Amino acid sequence: MKRSEVNQILKQTGHFFARHHIQLPPFARFTPQRWQQLDPKAWQELFDLKLGWDITAFGGNHFFTQGLTLFTLRNGSVSGTPYPKCYAEKIMHVREGQVTPMHFHWRKQEDIINRGGGNLIVELWNSDAFEQ
């Protein structure tokens, strides 16, 4: 995906979040120059837990049919150390017609809250010891 496409997606998502009164932390709007001015050690948890923006087409080239824009606000370490949180908080923007592949977590808890007013279809399955 070209940087210009990423920038346009971020802009559209920012407008969508604003319309629905979703407030993001200040680092959501940091410029590359601002990031370079920061002390990396002071922001290590953010880097380690991959907080911030994620725009994905899940390995494909069809973002507008199988894609997702999300902002991770809170996350924990899989092992529980050094960040013992079992809860992830992510704000997602799924566009009309987009689907996201299924996945699961052994140790994470997720709440799914539809703030945008669209139809949200979720299919749930139990997994076995072989992750099937």
Language-model segment annotations:
Residues 91:
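Short, conserved active-site entrance elements at the starts or edges of catalytic domains
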Residues 95-96, 108-110, 114-132:
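Glycine- and acidic-residue-biased ligand/ion/polar-headgroup-sensing regions
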Residues 1-87:
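A short, N-terminal "cap"/entry segment at the start of jelly-roll beta-barrel domains
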Residues 79-88, 99-116:
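A short beta-loop-beta micro-motif enriched in histidine and acidic residues
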